């Protein structure tokens, strides 16, 4: 059992026996790991095992069983996110997506950095819906999905109107619409934004502002992509869907 130090983000915890907990932490150096916390009611760790807690952890990794947290420091609990039910719902969904996208014990420092930066920007007050859309699009490759929103799948032109084709898992230009009579008939702005989301940098995020109509169209199409290509529906996403139904009442 080796001693390791790493930044980590708590994904979730669950009960284990009467007074113990299992805590899954996404670590920067060792991927997602499950940790055993004994006697949680008397443990100093009771305050840092909640989801959306980030800290520097020292832990013992066990290759064959449960691992153990030895110590922690520099704890951040994303207070702004936790004080807003909508922001919290989207942040929880992003956590769940990261958890679903890679296997446990598999190091992925790039995804860790992307997740942390997404949460940091949500905490700063940036648009959590747009941040979530960008996270959803850029994480598709972790599910083995590669979609082309940039150029026509047939002629590679980018200067004509484009529409998405499930048949080609890519966009078609107007001269090749006939190749798929069941193309999506998407708003051109949706195609443009998805192409931009695939390669956008964090510095660019601060300049994006979208109206409600475009946000709704993005949400509907990304939901369609996840249904058709990824095939998962997370509980945290269902909670968001329910929130949207009565969101105007709460805002």
From Swiss-Prot:
One protein family per Pfam: RecO_N
Query: What UniProt keywords apply to this chain's record, in alphabetical order?
Result: DNA damage, DNA recombination, DNA repair
- SUPFAM superfamilies in alphabetical order: ArfGap/RecO-like zinc finger, Nucleic acid-binding proteins
Please give the start and end residues of each transmembrane region.
Answer: none
Top-level taxon = Bacteria
Which GO biological-process labels does this protein carry?
A: DNA recombination; double-strand break repair
- Mind telling me which InterPro entries this protein's record contains? ARFGAP/RecO, DNA_rep/recomb_RecO_N, NA-bd_OB-fold, RecO, RecO_C
One GO cellular component term, please give it.
bacterial nucleoid
Q: Which NCBIfam families match?
A: reco
Function in brief: Involved in DNA repair and RecF pathway recombination.
Q: Which family does it belong to?
A: Belongs to the RecO family.
The name of this protein is DNA repair protein RecO
Species assigned in the record: Streptococcus pyogenes serotype M1
